[in-house]
Each structure stands twice: as structure tokens, then as C-alpha cells.
A protein has these predicted regions:
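A nucleotide- and high-energy phosphate-metabolite-utilizing enzyme signature
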Residues: 1-170
Length: 170
């Protein structure tokens, strides 16, 4: 498990829900940065995973019908930032007070972007009746209507996707 970055990341996100608190405390000792995956190695590993994912989802097909979770700027990128802050500072993004890492404005932008993308993802899952993260053309039109956008000088679907891409660039 200590060799696998995905397993380490999953263990980092563990939290006490019920039962013996000593177990979660013991896990925290085992997975602390000095015990395995020091922060610099962890960051390099996560950025390598991110680059591989970006390479996979950066083609034209995904530019026009992006994957909310995996396309560049999507929810997985926000999760990478969350994991890095957790690994380096011991706190999640919302609890980190490190101005040299992120300003309050940047943290707010990330939080707002995550909220928007999560809402779009939830709406898409609800609309399709399954865990589908791809914004296909038909879905884009329905989501634009759901967000209250109407055709004008710019089509509603274009308005929606402009908002979507602005958040993806955040």
C-alpha cells in the first residue's frame, strides 16, 4: 500500500465515523509524510497523474463535449489541489491558511468553481439517471435551460458553455 500513490491518497482522506478513535489515530501515524510519500514525492506523483489525465482528455472530442470530472480544469484537478494541501499542510483546502500557497481570493475562486462544477455534475447525473460525467451536446442544451438561460444574441447552450469554460479555467 505504501508504494501505491492511489492507495496512500485514499488513506489520507480517511476519517473517523464511528467506533474506536484509536484506529484512525494509528492510521494517521502510519501515513504521515515522514513515514511514506514525503510531500515533494507526493506532489510530483500527483502532478504526473494529472498530466497523464490531461493528455488523455485534451483532444478535440473532449474540448467540445468535456468530462466534468476528468477534463483539464475539472473536478479531479480541484481534488489534486485538495490532496496536495492535505499532504503538505495536514488540512484540506478550506482550512489551510498559507498565503504563500494560495491567497484567500484564489481559495474562494477554487471553492466557487468546485461548487459550480459539482452542481453541473449532480444535475447531469440526475438528468441522465446515471453517473455520466460527459457533457454531450444534448446534455448541454438541457443544462442551459435548467440554469435558466434562453436564446438571445447568443444561444443558451453557448451561454452555458461559456460559463462552464470560465470555471474550468479557474
Amino acid at each position: 500500500a505504501t508504494e501505491d500513490l492511489t492507495v496512500v491518497t485514499t488513506m489520507m482522506e480517511s476519517r473517523h465515523l464511528a467506533g474506536d478513535t484509536g484506529l484512525i489515530e494509528a492510521l494517521a501515524v502510519i501515513i504521515n509524510p515522514s513515514a511514506m510519500w514525503p510531500p515533494n514525492d507526493f506532489i510530483r506523483g500527483k502532478l504526473s497523474e494529472q498530466q497523464n489525465r490531461h493528455d488523455r482528455y485534451s483532444n478535440t472530442e473532449y474540448a467540445l463535449e468535456p468530462n466534468i470530472k476528468s477534463s483539464p480544469g475539472g473536478l479531479r484537478d480541484l481534488q489534486v489541489i485538495e490532496w496536495i494541501t492535505l499532504r503538505c499542510f495536514g488540512n484540506g483546502l478550506s482550512d489551510v491558511n498559507e498565503p504563500d500557497f494560495l491567497s484567500e481570493t484564489e481559495r474562494d475562486q477554487l471553492r466557487n468553481g468546485q461548487e459550480f462544477l459539482s452542481q453541473v455534475r449532480f444535475a447531469l447525473h440526475n438528468m441522465t439517471g446515471r453517473a455520466d460525467d460527459r457533457l454531450l451536446f444534448d446534455h448541454q442544451k438541457k443544462l442551459a435551460a435548467l440554469w435558466g438561460m434562453v436564446d438571445g444574441d447568443t444561444l443558451a447552450v453557448e451561454q452555458f458553455m461559456q460559463v462552464y469554460y470560465r470555471w474550468m479555467k479557474t
